[in-house]
Structures are given as structure tokens and as C-alpha cells.
Amino acid sequence: MSIKVLNNNDKEVNVLHFQGKNVDILWRTFALVKNYCELNPIEDYLSLVSCWTDNNNCYLYQQLKNNNIELINALPYNYDYTQKWNMINKIKFYIDCLENRVNTKYVMLLDGYDVLFTSTKDILKKFKKTGYRIIFNTSYNNYPEEDIDYIENREEKLGFFHYFNAGCCIGYREDLIRFYKECLDFVYIYNPLQSEQKILRHCFAKYSNDKKQKFIWLDYKREIFHTMALTTCSYDANTRILKINNNYEGDKIKRQNKKKI
């Protein structure tokens, strides 16, 4: 019997992002989700896309393969696996992959090494309900720690998870192509960590404080995506429900440490 994963509002969530070292910190939760979340077939006209170089370490690929669900690798067939990884190329790979998926209307772009599905139920229903063309994951972590995308009254408006996270998104295929092409306009930005997160955030900033735009926004209610940084989890073996809670104590410690600096 499959387990069910709920956010702190008791709503079923679809995708967990164990960003950074959270695969190691929340390894029990990770193992529960990877081994005991049974997934139904993906809805028609929705494609799942990622980039990965090692099938053995791509947990998302392994999970979806075990559930007979296709995960498309955006890396080209002639990709040189010996070359140094370049996040700018990752953006270009996504664009090329999406342009070739002409029969796909919706696409979900996902990190391969620290993302798992908990459910495939009602993904498109939740997405369409937002009214936006693209929805990105959110995180408590402001990474990189710069004022890039301004949102008025960010924390009051969006809650605990209020920063853009590039690890997961869903959108209409043609709009994702448009957005990722716009991201290439920001590749000149100084980016010592070679992170596409910084580039994508600069592009997101073009839209983030425009209250009238309905092009791109954040899944701050965590109805589709849920970042696992600063969370705690509790599992009830009787109901087979895994509950995710915001770690406000961790939040307080983080704020106190910032004040000391």
C-alpha cells in the first residue's frame, strides 16, 4: 500500500526537492518516499524532463523507471560526458529538448539527483488553477544571497517558503521555451558558482513585482512542489501518512546567526 505525503496545510503534495545536503539529513523520509510512494501514469500531454549523467545516482530516474513512467533526459545523444559541467549549457539543453517535444503541451522540469515524486495525482488540475503559464518551486533559502527578484512584502505575502527555486517547475511548453530563451540574456552576469539558479532568478525578476502579469509565479503554497530545507517530518504507520512541517526553530536559529554576523 502506498503512503501519502501531506504539507503543513494537510494538502497532498506531488514532488519533494531535497536540495543541498537534505538527502543525507532526511534520509529516512527520502527512503520512505522513494520506496513506498506508488505512482499512477502521468497525465496526457505532460512530459517530465531532467538532465543527468549517471543513471545509478539519478534517484528520480530510478523511481520513475520503477513506476513505468518516462523521464526524458535533455542531454543530447552526442553529449561529451568527460567535459566540465556547464549550467549555461543546461539551459540550452532544456530549450532544444522542449523545441523537439512538439506533441507535448505541458512540461515539468526537474533536478535529477535530489528530487522525488510522492504522487502524480491532479498535477495539471493544480497547475491550471493558478492561472499562470509557468510555476516554479519555492525555498526558504535566499540563494544566492542577493537582492535579485524583488517582491513587495515577500514573507508576509508568501509565507515561510518565499524565495524562487530553480530545481522544479511546470509550465506550458511554448512558454517555458520563451522563458529559458530570455534567461540566456542574463548569462553575462558574474556567476562564480556556475549556478543556473542565479541566471533564472534574474529573468524571473523581470516579472516578480508586476501584479498584473499572469506569466510566471511561485508555488508558495507548496501544492505541487515542496522544498525540504528547514522542515521536519512525521510518519504515522497506521494511516501511512507522512506529514511535512515547517521547522520554525531552525528558522529562528538561522535568523539569530544572521544578526550575529
Regions found by a protein language model. Give the residues of each.
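Catalytic core and acceptor-binding pocket of nucleotide-sugar-dependent glycosyltransferases
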Residues: 1-27, 161-261
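Short, high-confidence coil segments that cap the C-terminus of an alpha-helix
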Residues: 11-13, 102-104, 131-133, 239
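Short His-Asn-centered micro-motif
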Residues: 19, 50-52, 110-112, 119, ...
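N-terminal anchoring/stem segment of glycosyltransferases
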Residues: 19-106, 129, 174
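Conserved beta-strand elements of beta-rich interaction domains across eukaryotes
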Residues: 21-23, 53, 78-79, 114-115, ...
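A generic structural motif
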Residues: 71-81, 136-140, 192-197, 217-224
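A conserved donor-nucleotide-binding helix/loop in the catalytic core
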Residues: 81-110, 116-122, 161-164, 195-199
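Conserved donor-nucleotide/metal-binding helix-loop-beta segment in metal-dependent transferases, i.e.
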Residues: 115-155
